[in-house]
């Protein structure tokens, strides 16, 4: 695996993803001349970077899909021995200001989730990082009922944002999506709308997919 140009076709991307399934992180890193860190404490994004490199992902900015020329977003998903997701999945930052006129159809969440290449990875902490395996890829598009559920949650959560109810948002709102603070620390502030319509300093919030929803995606794939 040498110069990794971006895949030109969806089938080529899927073939690349299938070709790395079953490899350990150490084996894949060796092919790419990368060093496996001892753990992820200081390198939280290392696994994502490893998979992106192996597949030739191009997104220069997080605002774009990872394979924007193919209309595909890449998501690694850590799972346990039973294949159940170990964490929620970040989708995109929520527009806390300048969000008038944003609809579900023009939203970043819908754009990012229109087609996703899921790469399950072994994520249990007792498995040394170098020995964890890459799983079988899943190319997914939301069914109409899944999109309806996503849309319902997105619209409910956006209502809180637009109406200046930021302080009322909790991670419990939403069936398949949730809003949570997104940032390395509580000092990273952004602008939002206060309850009287004024501009306030607030924590950046991110949309996350709940584990139950991503578990459903993985389960549906295995049942096919």
UniProtKB/Swiss-Prot annotation:
Subcellular location: Cytoplasm
Organism superkingdom: Bacteria
Keywords: Cytoplasm, DNA damage, DNA repair, Endonuclease, Hydrolase, Nuclease
Record's GO cellular component terms: cytoplasm
GO-annotated biological processes: DNA modification; mismatch repair
One Gene Ontology MF term: DNA binding
UniProt KW Electron transport keyword: no
InterPro entries from the UniProt entry: DNA_mismatch_repair_MutH, DNA_rep_MutH/RE_typeII_Sau3AI, DNA_rep_MutH/T2_RE_sf, Restrct_endonuc-II-like
HAMAP family given in the database record: MutH
Function: Sequence-specific endonuclease that cleaves unmethylated GATC sequences. It is involved in DNA mismatch repair.
Family: Belongs to the MutH family.
Protein known as: DNA mismatch repair protein MutH
Native source species: Histophilus somni (strain 129Pt) (Haemophilus somnus)
Taxonomy of the source species: Bacteria, Pseudomonadati, Pseudomonadota, Gammaproteobacteria, Pasteurellales
Gene giving rise to this polypeptide: mutH
């Amino acid at each position: 695996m040498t110069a990794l140009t971006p895949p030109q076709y969806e089938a080529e991307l899927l073939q690349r993803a299938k070709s790395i399934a079953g490899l350990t992180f150490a084996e894949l890193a060796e092919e790419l001349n990368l060093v496996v860190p001892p753990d992820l404490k200081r390198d939280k994004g290392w696994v994502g970077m490893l998979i992106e490199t192996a597949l030739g992902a191009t997104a220069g900015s997080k605002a774009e899909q990872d394979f924007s020329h193919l209309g595909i977003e890449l998501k690694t998903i850590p799972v346990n021995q039973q294949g159940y997701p170990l964490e929620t999945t970040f989708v995109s930052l929520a527009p806390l200001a300048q969000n008038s006129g944003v609809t579900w159809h023009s939203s970043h969440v819908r754009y990012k989730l229109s087609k996703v290449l899921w790469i399950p990875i072994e994520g249990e902490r007792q498995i040394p990082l170098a020995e964890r395996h890459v799983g079988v890829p899943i190319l997914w598009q939301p069914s109409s009922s899944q999109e309806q559920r996503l849309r319902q949650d997105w619209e409910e959560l956006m209502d809180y944002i637009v109406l200046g109810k930021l302080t009322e948002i909790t991670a419990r709102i939403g069936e398949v999506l949730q809003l949570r603070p997104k940032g390395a620390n509580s000092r990273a502030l952004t602008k939002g709308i206060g309850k009287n319509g004024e501009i306030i300093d607030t924590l950046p919030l991110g949309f996350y997919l709940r584990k139950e929803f991503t578990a459903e995606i993985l389960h549906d794939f295995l049942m096919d």
